[in-house]
Amino acid sequence: MKLLEGKVALVTGAGRGIGKAIALRYAQEGADVAFTDLAINEAVEETTKELEAMGVKAKAYASNAANFDETHEVVKQVVEDFGRIDVLVNNAGITKDGLMMRMSEAQWDAVINVNLKSAFNFIHAVTPIMAKQRGGSIINMSSVVGVSGNAGQCNYSASKAGMIGLAKSI
């Protein structure tokens, strides 16, 4: 038996990059995979096909992870489609690098909203489900810059430090 056989994983921001790699690895271990991305595009459709080719159920959901109501609706739909959520991987993230003195409020807000607020949104939506199931795992993707900081990435560093604090507090 594979490590995650019979489990359902929800991976945010998994249309490409690290999120896609996580989704593919979970599928290799037998998990059915629900995943989100900002829009359903060619890359997302290709990821879905790759997951299904591994013999698991897979479905992509368009979601603005920074929107509280949208994330709750996506989680509701995942439960309707898959029956449960055993693993949440908060991976959705962006960068908008720049020195603090040149950074706009919009750049700050965009990174905090996608990288940190989205994790709160999805955790808020899945914890009642996991509590009812009497189990589940939540993985928050952070970065070394959440601990050390990084010049030119104060928004990104703050968002990743927030992810660490969030993980320690739930």
Q: What do these predicted regions represent?
A:
Residues 101, 148-154:
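Active-site loop immediately N-terminal to the catalytic Tyr-X3-Lys motif
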Residues 99-100, 107-112:
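Substrate-binding pocket helix/loop in short-chain dehydrogenase/reductase
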Residues 8, 15-17:
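Conserved glycine-rich cofactor-binding loop
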Residues 41, 62-74, 105:
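The beta1-alpha1 cofactor-binding region of Rossmann-like NAD(H)/NADP(H)-dependent oxidoreductases
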Residues 123, 159, 167:
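Active-site helix of classical SDR
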Residues 29-46:
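Conserved glycine-rich Rossmann-like NAD(P)H-binding loop of the short-chain dehydrogenase/reductase
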Residues 143:
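Residue(s) in the substrate-gating loop at a strand-loop-helix junction
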